[in-house]
């Protein structure tokens, strides 16, 4: 184990020092909800065991962003600077989600330079969960709730403070910067403190603590399952599940002109919306909720896995907690695979 222990009463001071050099994004209260936001004051940070309502996805893949601009003379606007950012307090499910987005935006046939620039300018600091939250099923997706290697530093909390485990060279450099700043309250992890970083057993395969939730077998049989129509009946097509999801990445482009300046924007979209697949001819290959809801589940559990090697559901439970119709993606997948779907 390689890392340090940060006393709990020093975490705010540590965040304040980081804010002198970096944009720090962390869980904080906003209108009563716990969300990831850019901190204006280190006292805002909330590092309890409560799950954030939204994931930090929007700080790497913004809900709306300008990607190109030019004036009437043909002058193209220069790309804006990407601030050096620390994403702090990212849960294992959201770290796994960032692996999915990285596979889609960087490791596929094309590289999304906007996502890549933000990712390269970001230091990821993970935070383990202590307990399972309502709607969560990360361990049934094969994700440990209290550990992750998909970050630069990983924090584990106990009554004394936080064990900061160094995962990457970027993480080591950050801790070296803090130490160089004269902070002497860090204790190296060694001897009796080594147990501080011991995690719950989270083995996979034959030793998995939970049965792994996935869609297997013949893809066409799942696609043609006659239960999709009944399953989708309760869906109201609001798109909340897509906007709250840490892995959803559908988007659209639109152009806007103002005072001689034209800009192209990218903004989030959702396959749950009727017009998402509407053709200019008027034809829509997904005309009803049945086709759209099936697409959402199949995309997450089958198509992304086929194309990029990951299941695009990390069991974070946000869609389960947020759906106004009470739809549960875990129950849907289990019901489809077991043939036991029932409307509750």
Kindly give the residue locations of the regions a language model identified:
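Internal helical hairpin/lid segments
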Residues: 239-256
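Iron-sulfur-associated redox domains of electron-transfer enzymes in respiratory
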Residues: 1-218
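Active-site-flanking alpha-helical
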Residues: 98, 246-250, 324
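A generic structural-conservation signal
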Residues: 26, 244-245, 322
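Ferredoxin-type iron-sulfur electron-transfer modules in oxidoreductases and energy-metabolism complexes
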Residues: 210-233, 251-344
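Residue-level detector of anion-binding/catalytic polar loops
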Residues: 23, 241, 319
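Short, well-structured alpha-helical interface segments that form or flank functional binding sites
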Residues: 88, 226, 230-236, 240-243
């Amino acid at each position: 184990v390689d890392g340090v222990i940060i006393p709990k009463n020093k975490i705010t001071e540590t965040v304040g020092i980081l804010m002198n050099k970096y944009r720090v994004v962390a869980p904080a209260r906003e209108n009563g909800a716990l969300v990831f936001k850019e901190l204006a004051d280190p006292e805002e940070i909330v590092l309890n065991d409560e799950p954030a309502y939204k994931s930090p996805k929007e700080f790497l893949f913004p809900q709306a962003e300008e990607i190109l601009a030019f004036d009437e003379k043909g002058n193209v606007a220069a790309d804006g600077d990407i601030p050096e950012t620390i994403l702090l307090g990212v849960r294992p499910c959201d770290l796994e989600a960032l692996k999915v987005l990285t596979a889609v935006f960087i490791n596929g046939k094309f590289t999304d330079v906007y996502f890549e620039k933000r990712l390269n300018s970001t230091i990821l600091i993970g935070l383990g969960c202590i307990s399972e939250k309502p709607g969560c099923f990360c361990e049934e997706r094969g994700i440990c709730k209290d550990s992750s290697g998909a970050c630069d530093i990983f924090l584990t909390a106990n009554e004394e403070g936080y064990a900061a485990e160094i995962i990457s060279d970027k993480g080591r450099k950050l801790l070296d910067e803090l130490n160089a700043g004269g902070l002497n309250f860090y204790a190296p992890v060694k001897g009796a403190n080594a147990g501080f970083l011991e995690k719950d057993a989270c083995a996979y395969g034959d030793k998995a603590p939970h049965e792994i939730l996935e869609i297997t077998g013949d893809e066409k049989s799942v696609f043609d399952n006659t239960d999709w129509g009944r399953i989708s009946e309760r869906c109201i097509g609001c798109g909340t599940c897509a906007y709250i999801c840490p892995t959803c990445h559908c988007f659209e482009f639109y152009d806007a002109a103002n005072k001689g300046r034209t800009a192209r924007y990218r903004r989030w979209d959702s396959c749950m919306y009727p017009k998402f697949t509407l053709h200019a001819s008027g034809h829509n290959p997904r005309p009803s909720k049945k086709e759209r809801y099936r697409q959402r589940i199949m995309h997450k559990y089958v198509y992304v896995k086929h194309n990029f090697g990951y299941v695009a559901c990390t069991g974070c439970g946000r869609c389960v907690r947020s759906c106004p119709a009470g739809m549960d993606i875990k129950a849907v997948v289990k019901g489809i695979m077991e043939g036991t779907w029932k409307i509750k």
